[in-house]
């Protein structure tokens, strides 16, 4: 099963990949992950961006597949010559917008997934022999993350270094507040963020606040309200309604590493609150 990048936010990309890895278990296929040029968190070497953040899941690459001329491929828009294409009839046309259940019981030797898939959609199709059969979606996501998401050691070292310097020995609350382009997805985003602030207000006054936000405006609000209790990493943020992954930075891998650092630091904190409609918060909460 060739799992291509979905081409959206970092943890949206990871969530899609986890769903496809679950699909590979259901269909007994060998997963090959390739986050190509359409991945927003790619650098300029045109390789597999997944390996910039996590340990590789297979020694087989997309180029190895391209050299096997006896492959039969589903959907049939793909050939061994165009496996690296990133926008091949993705939204319209033959083989576009395929959901995970359409990959079940396919006879082809290679199946290619290039459109967003979700764990929830696949849960009813888990066979009784699967260890996650009958489990909640959150349990399945935890199972998949523990099995497949092994952060690179250099990223884990950065996490531990920051934690030891800024968070260790304190009662810590991780807070995720979205701004920028999220307001186009969530109409009442500001009121939801205000609910998060109300929750933080109710905590003990000595709690250190590890703030994850993509928006300078919300960072300023938290600093004005909570002062030195607010701890943040030095990462790219925006001061307008354009998401950081859409800024002309030139190196998407920097954003990806920053997202990894923030997320895994949040997992080290004693408690967490965030927006459940964000993939970042959903992954941390799971």
Predicted regions and their residues:
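Donor nucleotide-activated moiety binding/catalytic core segment of transferases
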Residues: 191, 232-269
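Short active-site oxyanion
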Residues: 205-209, 269-272
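A donor-sugar binding/catalytic signature common to diverse glycosyltransferases
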Residues: 18, 257-286
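Secretory-pathway glycan-assembly enzymes, especially type II membrane glycosyltransferases
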Residues: 1-206
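Conserved helicase motor "Helicase C" RecA-like lobe of SF1/SF2 P-loop NTPases
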Residues: 222-233
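Short, polar loop motifs at secondary-structure junctions
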Residues: 213-218
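A short glycine/serine-rich beta->alpha loop
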Residues: 4-9, 250-252, 270-271
């Amino acid at each position: 099963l060739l799992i291509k990048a979905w081409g959206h936010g970092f943890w949206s990309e990871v969530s899609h990949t986890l769903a496809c890895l679950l699909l590979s278990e259901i269909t007994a296929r060998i997963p090959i992950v390739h986050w190509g040029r359409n991945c927003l968190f790619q650098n300029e070497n045109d390789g597999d961006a997944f390996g910039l953040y996590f340990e590789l899941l297979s020694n087989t690459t997309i180029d190895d597949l391209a050299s096997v001329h006896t492959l039969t491929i589903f959907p049939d828009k793909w050939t061994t010559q165009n496996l690296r294409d990133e926008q091949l009839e993705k939204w319209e046309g033959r083989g576009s917008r395929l959901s995970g259940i359409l990959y079940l019981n396919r006879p082809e030797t290679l199946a290619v997934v290039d459109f967003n898939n979700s764990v929830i959609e696949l849960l009813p199709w888990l066979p009784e022999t699967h260890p996650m059969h009958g489990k909640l979606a959150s349990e399945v996501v935890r199972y998949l993350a523990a099995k497949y998401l092994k952060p690179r050691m250099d990223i884990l070292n950065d996490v531990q270094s920051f934690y030891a310097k800024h968070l260790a020995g304190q009662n810590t609350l991780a807070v995720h507040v979205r701004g920028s382009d999220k307001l186009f997805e969530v109409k009442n985003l500001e009121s939801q963020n205000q609910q998060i602030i109300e929750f933080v207000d109710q905590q003990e006054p000595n709690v250190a606040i590890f703030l994850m936000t993509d928006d300078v405006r919300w960072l300023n609000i938290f600093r004005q309200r909570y002062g030195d209790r607010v701890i943040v990493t030095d990462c790219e943020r925006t001061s307008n309604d354009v998401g950081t992954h859409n800024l002309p930075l030139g190196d998407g891998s920097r954003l990806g590493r920053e997202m990894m650092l923030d997320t895994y630091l949040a997992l080290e904190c004693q408690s967490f609150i965030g927006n459940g409609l964000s993939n970042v918060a959903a992954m941390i909460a799971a």
